[in-house]
Amino acid sequence: SINKITNKLDDFSKARKLRVSNLDEVGEQIVPVDLSNPDLLRTKPKNSPDARKWLDKGGSIEVDTSKIPPEWTYTDWEGNTIRYVDGFPDFKSAGFVDQEVRLKDGFDTRSKDFSRADKLAEKPKAPDAIWHHHEDGETLQEIKTRIHARFTHRGGFSLKKR
């Protein structure tokens, strides 16, 4: 809706102002998350881990305010790091994608997509892995279930037209 778009533009405008105000002496624009900053918290990727709970568990969060929208990077208590680009987790750059399968006709239902991916994959999916719907609308990525569940997110399936 128009109101949602207007609110998002306001959030990005505030994030841009934050970007300028957060420059340190060497021009760094990556800052630890500040739970007392509502403007920054509004830029949190949809369905990403709750910031306070994440920090309470011993994880860390950094926000690159030079990006529009700002990129949030979560590091868990085991040292695993995932960057959220345009609101989506980038499992591939983090080295967590074991294999990818492209569904040329795009996504259908989760069960049908998983079945198609199992048939198209070069090797069988590991028993401790899951297929992640990438935001491009046609790629499934094999990722360890533990990592996929820990780094909560809005996946590519959420963009599928219903």
How should each PLM-predicted stretch be described?
Residues 5-130, 135-162:
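Nuclease and nuclease-like effector domains acting on nucleic acids or nucleotide cofactors
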